[in-house]
């Protein structure tokens, strides 16, 4: 943001955070949008490494431009391989259930939707159109259901 580096932006940053305090309460908000703007970040590798500490999901997508800039895009379209991300998260969820953890659910925030249809007639903050967010949520839910049936 404004040319300033992010405080947490790599797998090693997340690993350092979870190692500082060995408690399930020391958790992560996993944002695919923020992490996907660095082409070197491998989101599935981050999930495999620190997934046991992910408590909240912010699933969104970006398109990277040749000059290093990016813009937000649809939830399942863009540089994030949302299929592989959701699959890794579902595997983590099944692992938690098997262990008997009470925090197996990871709530998802489906904002940053694409403005569409009647959204153009509604007042909303950028990235928060009603129908666009519902479309994104339904795409993610369908993806989740399809992957669950293969696990």
Regions found by a protein language model. Name each.
Residues 1-151:
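Histidine-acidic metal/acid-base catalytic patches
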């Amino acid at each position: 943001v404004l040319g300033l580096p992010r405080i947490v932006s790599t797998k090693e940053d997340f690993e350092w955070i979870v190692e500082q305090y060995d408690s399930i309460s020391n958790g992560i908000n996993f944002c695919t949008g923020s992490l996907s703007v660095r082409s070197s970040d491998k989101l599935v590798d981050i999930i495999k490494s620190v997934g046991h500490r992910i408590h909240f999901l912010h699933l969104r997508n970006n398109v990277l431009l040749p000059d290093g800039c990016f813009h937000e895009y649809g939830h399942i379209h863009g540089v994030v391989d949302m299929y592989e991300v959701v699959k890794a998260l579902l595997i983590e969820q099944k692992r938690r259930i098997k262990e008997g953890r009470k925090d197996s659910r990871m709530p998802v925030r489906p904002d940053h939707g694409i403005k569409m249809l009647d959204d153009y007639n509604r007042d909303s903050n950028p990235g928060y159109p009603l129908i666009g967010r519902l479309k994104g949520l339904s795409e993610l839910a369908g993806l989740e259901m399809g992957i669950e049936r293969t696990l």
